């Protein structure tokens, strides 16, 4: 009896497995947590929360109800504050770095668009674009800190894939969220 050709056998096995795992839009899609139909490039106030992957405590610690930033926490803070220099239409308000997450109130003051060519129309810059750029820069800087300064290592990704936002409508809503952000270190539960 002849031995089967191993590369052909592996190819056929892989083909059979992959054919059984076809794309199913009911199973294989990312659900957006953004408000459906809302234009996130338009002016508005947003409450933002960004979490570390697996809630890893990488940015400092809370002591005596005060947040003590480590070097990584200071880096995150500096990158957040730099957003207003990168985006002319962004105003930053209340924010708080926590050991495993970050809260802020961000205001988009006007519609902005990236440069376009005749072949591609202007793309408006959205809240997701701004937060995505911030998360990318923070990750690159954090990796540099791990390599150069021995910051705590992380597995896989530094930050969770998404971010949470709430559209703030009205001054009372903004004041309530600003108080929540301010009080975050006081209400921290070290579990």
Q: Could you say what each language-model-derived stretch is?
A:
Residues 1-191:
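Short catalytic/metal-binding and nucleic-acid-binding patches
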